[in-house]
């Protein structure tokens, strides 16, 4: 969530480096090797990756409820391919630099992630919280 004064990360990063996720995975018979599930996947929750479902990978998300007040401008939904290469300040800067070109914002974010060397799957959705829909 972004406005001109603050950036707020409101989701839980479900990664194999998280102690709670490690414990959950190991209880389900999985192994963390080199901070990856079965040595393959850095995230601990995912759609797909069916070969790891019996090793502790689940698709159940953490859900966060957030009151959206009038001060918030944008909500960025992005994959770990974006977040592993760009931080909140990077995304905020890109967002407000491209405010007059909203339709291009997600493309610019994903291109910047690629420029920073991300080789993971990269996807991004930008939600304009100020736009009124009638």
Where does each model-flagged region fall?
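PP2C/PPM-type serine/threonine phosphatase catalytic core
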Residues: 1-134
């Amino acid at each position: 969530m972004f406005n001109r004064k603050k950036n707020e990360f409101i989701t839980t990063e479900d990664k194999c480096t998280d102690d709670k996720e490690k414990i959950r995975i190991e209880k389900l018979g999985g192994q963390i090797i080199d901070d990856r599930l079965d040595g393959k996947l850095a995230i601990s929750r995912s759609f797909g990756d069916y070969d790891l479902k019996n090793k502790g990978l689940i698709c159940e998300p953490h859900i966060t409820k957030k009151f959206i007040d009038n001060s918030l401008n944008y909500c960025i939904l992005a994959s770990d391919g974006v977040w592993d290469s760009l931080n909140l300040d990077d995304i905020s800067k890109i967002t407000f630099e491209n405010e007059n070109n909203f339709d291009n914002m997600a493309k610019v974010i994903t291109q910047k992630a690629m420029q920073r060397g991300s080789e993971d799957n990269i996807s991004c959705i930008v939600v304009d919280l100020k736009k009124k829909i009638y």
